[in-house]
């Protein structure tokens, strides 16, 4: 349990600001560093933070042509609180108007890594699922975020159906499969 009195100042060890992070951005950077062609479909706000994110991704050789800058919006900013081996992430997704891009034929990726987006983006999942249906050669890796887990397997069944690789921790695996936490094999 995280508990702190309001109205006080709390000391901390240090802080570190990282631009262009999150599940999908991290994956894009990792793939680029491995020498693979990587791009990011994402949204940022029309602010310094959004420009810093795009600049950081370009520096890592991640294609940012499909990063949409949302006018009059701010960029997502999350806080990670670390204590020993444990962490808590304070999240807030901005309410962007999500649209899956129209790729030119030579820009269609071999793989899509789909991850956490905001609560209001459920219709966006349908756009992604429809696009995947129209592009059966494209493989999908899926790491559901907080709001996708809340939406449930039934609502996202078209995404799960097309998923080649899913990334879940044990608790999430129980939620998705209905299996037993104690029986790891039951979760596959």
Where are the regions a protein language model picked out?
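Beta-strand->loop->alpha-helix junctions that form or flank phosphate-binding loops
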Residues: 41-46, 65-74, 188
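Short, well-ordered strand-loop elements centered on a beta-strand within folded domains, enriched
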Residues: 11, 15, 48, 85-91
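Glycine-rich phosphate/adenosyl-contacting loop at the front of the ribokinase-like
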Residues: 1-41, 51-52, 59
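Glycine-rich phosphate-binding loop of ATP-grasp-fold ATP-dependent ligases
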Residues: 76-78
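A generic secondary-structure micro-motif detector
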Residues: 16-18, 42-43, 118, 146
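Short glycine/serine/threonine-rich phosphate/pyrophosphate-binding segments
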Residues: 23-26, 49, 74, 123
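Charged, low-complexity surface patches
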Residues: 20, 46, 121
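Ribokinase/PfkB-type carbohydrate-kinase core domain
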Residues: 55-69, 81-188
């Amino acid at each position: 349990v995280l508990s702190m009195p309001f109205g006080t100042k709390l000391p901390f060890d240090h802080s570190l600001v990282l631009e262009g992070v999150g599940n999908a951005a991290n994956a894009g950077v990792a793939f680029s560093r491995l020498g693979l062609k990587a791009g990011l479909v994402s949204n940022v706000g029309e602010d310094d933070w959004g420009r810093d994110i795009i600049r950081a991704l370009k520096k890592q050789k991640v294609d940012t042509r499909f990063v949409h800058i949302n006018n009059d919006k701010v960029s997502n900013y999350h806080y990670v609180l670390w204590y020993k081996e444990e962490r808590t992430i304070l999240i807030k997704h901005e309410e962007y108007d999500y649209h899956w891009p129209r790729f030119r034929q030579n820009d269609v990726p071999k793989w899509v890594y789909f991850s956490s987006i905001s609560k209001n983006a459920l219709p966006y999942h349908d756009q992604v699922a429809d696009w995947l249906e129209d592009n059966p050669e494209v493989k999908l890796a899926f790491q559901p975020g907080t709001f996708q887990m809340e939406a449930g397997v039934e609502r996202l069944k078209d995404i799960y159906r097309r998923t080649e690789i899913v990334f879940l921790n044990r608790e999430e695996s129980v939620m998705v499969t209905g299996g037993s936490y104690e029986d790891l094999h039951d979760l596959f």
